[in-house]
């Protein structure tokens, strides 16, 4: 019995390690080797434009960032959330296809079969655009809620508690937020897929390159890994009204209250521009990161996992007196 239990734990750990490592070779993931390389090229461009005297390697991999306590929290949460994906999220990914099927069924029962169906090319283009825009819009809206609603902020605060940024800070999120994000992705995928399945007579497909949504692929190539970094890559002013640049996202992480709740878009800056939360790179100088002067509150995996619950406990305890 004990041996079987140990074997189960070993298999789960092995699966978690393999899933974590797979991110570097999965073209759908931001830290795929190709996107890391293009981010390094863009970082070299920023380096050459600056007056930094140290070597490029020292500029890109400073010990104070990559070996900081903040970074090790990033690494541990990246691994821990891989475990959460296997145990809690992975088994339910298939619900996206169920939602798509029942959305298609609902439309068919309610309106009958469409008199005219979208062509393959139309479906290919429109489905890809719809998935990209709606995913980004709802990502923005949920992100907005994370910042505006105290209950959700206590969980999202974990992401903002990073005092140094590196590409793995992308995965520095509380498991509760991870679950919310995955529910959002599953719902958007299911509903949009079901609608297009209905209107295309089941000829649904999307524009992909290397198995990745082509718009997501372009986004990842354009230095997505520099969003969580010390490399201040800025886009031309006109482009920053459309797409969030890496430095604009770094502004979002600033511990300056002036920039709290700014630049919350995932890919597109349009939502920020429309709702008044957009800040352009040129208007901002030096920034630093974090949410609390006492950084020891967030310097370990366990502290980050328990932080929201401790806050709720003290809130309830205080209000029961």
Where are these regions (language model features)?
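Membrane-embedded catalytic scaffold of the fatty acid hydroxylase/desaturase
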Residues: 80-92, 102-104, 114-288
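Specific transmembrane helices
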Residues: 30-109, 127-139
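Short, strongly hydrophobic alpha-helical membrane anchors
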Residues: 1-25
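Cytoplasmic juxtamembrane interface segments
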Residues: 12-20, 51-74, 116-117, 231, ...
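A membrane-cytosol interface segment of integral membrane proteins
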Residues: 282-321
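A transmembrane-helix-recognition feature enriched in membrane-embedded lipid enzymes
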Residues: 79, 266-277, 305-320
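Short, charged cytosolic
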Residues: 2-9, 45, 49-63, 144-160
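Peri-membrane helix termini and adjoining interfacial loops of integral membrane proteins
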Residues: 6-13, 101-111, 157
């Amino acid at each position: 019995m004990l041996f079987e239990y140990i074997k189960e734990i070993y298999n789960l750990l092995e699966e978690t390690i393999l899933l974590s490592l797979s991110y570097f070779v999965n073209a759908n993931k931001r830290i795929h080797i190709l996107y890391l390389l293009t981010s390094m090229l863009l970082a070299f461009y920023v380096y050459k434009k600056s007056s930094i005297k140290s070597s490029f390697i020292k500029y890109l991999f400073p010990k104070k960032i990559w070996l900081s306590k903040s970074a090790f929290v990033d690494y541990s949460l990246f691994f821990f959330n891989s475990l959460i994906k296997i145990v809690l999220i992975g088994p339910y990914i298939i619900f996206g296809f169920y939602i798509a099927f029942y959305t298609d069924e609902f439309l068919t029962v309610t309106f009958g079969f469409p008199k005219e169906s979208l062509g393959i090319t139309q479906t290919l283009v429109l489905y890809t655009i719809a998935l990209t825009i709606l995913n980004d819009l709802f990502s923005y809206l949920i992100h907005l809620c994370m910042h505006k609603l105290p209950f959700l902020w206590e969980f999202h605060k974990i992401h903002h508690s990073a005092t140094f940024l590196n590409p793995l800070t992308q995965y520095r999120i509380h498991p509760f937020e991870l679950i919310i994000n995955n529910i959002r992705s599953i719902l958007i995928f299911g509903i949009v897929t079901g609608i297009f399945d209905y209107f295309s007579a089941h000829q649904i497909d999307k524009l992909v390159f290397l198995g990745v949504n082509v718009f997501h692929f372009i986004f990842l190539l354009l230095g997505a890994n520099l969003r969580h970094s010390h490399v201040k890559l800025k886009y031309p002013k006109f482009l920053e009204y459309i797409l969030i640049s890496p430095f604009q996202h770094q502004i979002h992480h600033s511990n300056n209250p002036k920039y709290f709740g700014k630049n919350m878009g995932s890919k597109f800056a349009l939502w920020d521009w429309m709702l008044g939360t957009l800040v352009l790179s040129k208007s901002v100088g030096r920034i630093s990161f974090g949410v609390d002067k006492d950084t020891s509150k967030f310097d370990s995996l366990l502290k980050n996992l328990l932080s929201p619950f401790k806050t709720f406990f003290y809130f309830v305890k205080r209000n029961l007196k």
